[in-house]
Amino acid sequence: MTTLDPAIAGRLKRNPDGLVPAVVQQHDTGEVLMLGWMDDEALARTLTTGRATYWSRSRQEYWLKGETSGHVQWVKEVRLDCDGDTILVKVDQVGAACHTGDRTCFDADLLSGADRPGPDARG
């Protein structure tokens, strides 16, 4: 078990299951890759090893990204948002980030936005 720095742990606002959402972004392009969940142990492992580790809510176990698929996330930067309730993990993604085999989990369904006018078109 890896211990999270108490100064970091004290800033986290966890959900009732002890988890914090982690938004994962490609470090050099800003592309949003996925959303994972971390508890203190997953965050400590991520900070210590330089590889992204998450808590799998479905399997109820730690998940080292790329351990079985080879689609590793090399961590470049980790930030905590202003409220302490969301983690931003900037990574160098090797291969697909999504379990579907897509590069990102956010490229399949556009719900809204593509046909909306920008601020200059409102008049």
UniProtKB/Swiss-Prot annotation:
This is Phosphoribosyl-AMP cyclohydrolase. Belongs to the PRA-CH family. Keywords: Amino-acid biosynthesis, Cytoplasm, Histidine biosynthesis, Hydrolase, Magnesium, Metal-binding, Zinc. Its main location: cytoplasm. GO terms for biological process: L-histidine biosynthetic process. Coiled coil: none annotated. Homodimer. Mg(2+) binds at D81, D83, D85. The keyword Magnesium applies. Binds 1 Mg(2+) ion per subunit. Binds 1 zinc ion per subunit. Zn(2+) binds at C82, C98, C105. InterPro entries: PRA-CH, PRib_AMP_CycHydrolase_dom, PRib_AMP_CycHydrolase_sf. It comes from the Bacteria. Its EC number is 3.5.4.19. It is an enzyme of class 3 (hydrolase). GO terms for molecular function: magnesium ion binding; phosphoribosyl-AMP cyclohydrolase activity; zinc ion binding. It holds the Pfam family PRA-CH. Pathway: Amino-acid biosynthesis; L-histidine biosynthesis; L-histidine from 5-phospho-alpha-D-ribose 1-diphosphate: step 3/9. The gene is hisI. NCBIfam families: PRK00051.1 (NF000768). Its cofactor is Mg(2+); Zn(2+). It catalyses: 1-(5-phospho-beta-D-ribosyl)-5'-AMP + H2O = 1-(5-phospho-beta-D-ribosyl)-5-[(5-phospho-beta-D-ribosylamino)methylideneamino]imidazole-4-carboxamide. GO terms for cellular component: cytoplasm. Catalyzes the hydrolysis of the adenine ring of phosphoribosyl-AMP. It is found in: Cytoplasm.
